[in-house]
Amino acid sequence: LQEADRSRVWSGIKSLDPSSPVKYDDASFDLLHTTDRKLTLRDAMNLQRNRLEGTKYKPQDQMELDGKGIPKKGEFDAVYKYPISNPNVMEAHIFQLKDEVPASAGGGTMWLSMGSPRNAPYLPYYGNILNTYQAYQELGDHYNDRSWYWTISRINDLVAKYPDLFEDGAIRTEMERLESQWMVE
């Protein structure tokens, strides 16, 4: 495995099953795993937001903030690893299939994080919708304060650049509060 793949596969397995016996330096990882509990929608969201929490490793993009410079391509550090939720994630999807939702209505819910899921709430999308909130429809490849994507992207950039200002977890707490509300609606 490439180092960036290894760190994401290993941390994903450990995120969903902390008691898994896999080790970071295992030669390979099994494709399928089981856990002793049913995985939830929140587990899937946390997986895609994973930044190596609960491990001895730090996200690679933290190196510069720690005064160690920007990582050089092809060089690896024993502590800094490439996380699942990294600066290259532009959006994330979770497909939640539900027995009570007919196929004609999409069969379930697509949860979409418009922007990095690290600091963007997952929005529920349904297969039979005909329209969406106007801010979701704003197009363009430059910042636009009427665009949900660009607003969330700006928040993500600020949280990444100034982690000390946001270390209380208020943004994550508010995102999870909104998501939990939408899950029951």
Describe each model-derived feature in a short phrase:
Residues L1-E185:
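C-terminus-biased signal that marks the final domain/tail of proteins
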